[in-house]
Structure formats: C-alpha cells, structure tokens
UniProtKB/Swiss-Prot annotation:
Gene this chain is encoded by: alr
Name of the protein: Alanine racemase
N6-(pyridoxal phosphate)lysine modification, residue list: K34
Source species of the chain: Lawsonia intracellularis (strain PHE/MN1-00)
Enzyme Commission numbers on file: 5.1.1.1
Catalytic-site annotation from UniProt: K34, Y267
Length: 380
C-alpha cells in the first residue's frame, strides 16, 4: 500500500455552513454524497448531515447506500445509478435503499427479486426520465408508455420522479433548461394521475440557485455543499459565491535546493532557470491525485504566500520557485495544494481552471485515495 505524505483536512463547520446556506434557499434538500462524497469521505459527511437533521441523501451506487446502512444511518437513501445486478436488487430491497429505475433492465431486476423473494410486494422506487442529458432515464417523449408499464407492474411503487438538468448554470443555454423543465412538467402531470403521491426532484446545485421556481419537492445539491462555485467561469458566477471549501490539501517541503541559471528542473527539461533560483521540493504528486497538468502553471501556498510550480509534476514530488520568499521556508513546512487560509488560499475553481476541468473532478481526484492509500485525514 502506498503511504503518502499528503494530509487532507475536512472542515466540518464549513460543511455545516454550506448546508445551511442551501437550506436557506430551499429547505427540502437531498444532498448528493456519491463518489465518496466527492472525495470528502462519505461516512464523515453523512454523519454531519444526520446531525444537522437531513433526512434524505443521494448516493451513487447501492453499495454506497449499504455502507451507510451498516453505519446505522436511517435516512432515506436514493441510489442514483440504480441496480446493476440481482445482488444490487437484493441489497436495495432488504436494506431499504430506494433505487433509481432508469431503463427496463433495472426495472426487471427489482421486479424479479420482489416476485421470487418478497411475494410480489411492491418495492418503493424512483423513476428517472431523460429530458435532455442523454445519459440515464426513460424517454420523456414516451411517458404514456412508461405509465402503462408501471401500472401493470405491481411489484414496484413509484414514489419519486426525477430528471437531471444539463446546463442550468449557462445563461446562453436557458432555452435548453426551459425545455427540460417543460418536458419534466408534462411527464409529471401525467404520471401523477396514475400515482398521486409521487414526489419530484429536478435540480442540482446550479439549478437550486439559479432556477428556484423549478426545484420540485427535493433539490439534489452536490458541489456547492462542498464549497465549490457551480457557476465558476459563467456570467452567473455571483450566484455561487459565499460557499466555503470544505477540503484542504497540504504536503511537506522535503528539500530546498539552489538551481543555477541555465539549469533545467524536472523531467523532460520543460523549465530552465533564467537566473539562480531557490527551489522547494514538495512531497506530493500525481500519485496523490495532483494532476500532471499543473506542471509549470500551478501554484501552492506556503506561509500565506503563493509560489509557482516549475518543471513537471512527478509521481510523488513537485517543485516550486521560492526565490522571492519574504519569510524563511524550511524543510517540514506545509505547502497547501488546495486551501491555505487568507485571501491567497487556492480555491477548487482555480485548480480546475489550471487543470482544464471542473471543481468536482478536483475534489474527487485529490480525495479519491482516502481509505485506499495512507493519506493523513484530519477532521476539523
């Protein structure tokens, strides 16, 4: 097992703060804690949500839901990916995890288990329709056939109708969002006649914040809960301000070198010193989820000041130019890859921009090895 020198800090008070902001916009939230809570640790995050009185949570897989049931969580759990197998169906039914049914195959797996093991008892399920994502869901254009199918399938009890917005954060695609909302509304109106108590869920983080009139019974916020701005890089960026990054990532300075003018740094000779410089070697690299894409363009924070990465990010190391440091930097000092405190703290959105991705991937990548590698996890 790889033992990393990287330390991941999870700030629980920031998580609580972000949750309270979201609830102030709409009380009925179903926080998304899939993918190990976006890399933050599903157990830790679920415990905070429970302590804050959250009664509905959305996990990715049924296995994630089972993990929480083993931990004693009693909240309503929605498994967004639905059942993949008969074993998934069994776990969902036995442990009261509500599966998302998004195609005939996922429906059949639940029906089969109910008939064989439950005497045909109706299993509570969520029905997903595709209104434009092109990913999971029954076609919203064929909801009449869907309703007929569900009416003739007494082994399931549809309790939730959901879909997923494609681009609620992008104002130039508002027509797409409006179209999705209209499709969802038409389908819901028809399905509600057959299943009068069915609830709805449509919006994610940007949907909740930018489209408050179309939330439905539950909103499913994700990245905003963890402090990411879902509108970063769009004209609506101000709508996502105020959330606090929950994750901080730090690694130690493991060496300090003087590099002579004209000398190269790192693999491939991608950086040459124009003058004599001082370089700090940081004990973190792409093995820790810190992308090689940050080579020669990323920054770290040491003692409240930013320092630029020089040369390529290595497997377990990266190098930064500390020539212009106004404070003494020593071996063992902390370098923040994410966070760092103060106005110069590195935000998830900045890492995403340097990487050419989104904050979601940043958090998932940096936190992905929690539990698999020996990263130090500090709960604050």
């Amino acid at each position: 097992m790889y033992s990393s020198s990287v330390c991941i800090k999870i700030h629980l008070e920031r998580l609580r703060y972000n949750l309270r902001i979201l609830r102030s916009r709409y009380p009925n939230v179903m926080p998304v804690i899939k993918a190990n809570a976006y890399g933050h640790g599903i157990r830790v995050v679920a415990n905070v949500l429970r302590d804050e009185g959250v009664q509905h949570m959305a996990v990715g897989s049924i296995t994630e839901g089972f993990l929480l049931r083993q931990e004693g969580h009693q909240a309503f759990l929605l498994a967004l990916l639905g059942p993949f197998s008969e074993e998934d169906a069994r776990i969902a039914v036995v442990h009261n995890i509500t599966p998302v049914i998004h195609n005939i195959e996922s429906l059949q797996s639940i029906v089969h288990y109910s008939r064989v093991h439950q005497g045909g008892t109706a299993v509570p399920v969520a029905i997903k329709i595709d209104t434009g994502m092109g990913r999971l869901g029954f076609s919203s254009n064929d909801y009449i056939s869907l309703i007929d199918l569900l009416r003739h399938t007494p082994e399931v009890n549809p309790i939730l109708l959901l879909s997923h917005l494609v681009a609620p954060e992008i104002s130039s695609l508002d027509n797409v969002t409006h179209n999705q909302v209209e499709q969802f509304a038409r389908a819901y109106k028809a399905i509600k006649e057959a299943f009068p108590t069915i609830k709805t869920s449509l919006t994610n983080s940007p949907g909740l914040l930018a489209w408050p009139n179309y939330i439905g019974d539950f909103s499913r916020p994700g990245i905003a809960l963890y402090g990411g701005n879902p509108f970063y890089g769009t004209s609506r960026v101000s709508l996502g301000k105020g959330f606090l990054p929950v994750m901080e990532v730090e690694a130690p300075v493991v060496a300090i070198n003087t590099v002579s003018a004209g000398s190269s740094i790192g693999y491939g000779c991608t950086y040459y010193a124009k003058e004599d410089i001082r370089v700090a070697v940081i004990g973190a690299g792409y093995a820790d989820g810190y992308s090689r894409s940050f080579s020669n363009k990323g920054w770290v924070v040491i003692k409240g000041k930013r320092y630029r990465i020089v040369g390529r990010v290595c497997m377990q190391m990266l190098m930064v130019d500390i020539t212009n440091s106004h404070s003494k930097i020593s071996i063992g000092d902390k370098a923040f890859l994410l966070g760092g405190g103060g106005s110069l703290a590195i935000k998830p959105e900045e890492l995403a921009e340097w990487w050419g991705t989104i904050p979601h991937e940043v958090c998932c990548s940096l936190g992905s090895s929690i539990g698999a590698q020996q990263k130090q996890l500090v709960i604050i």
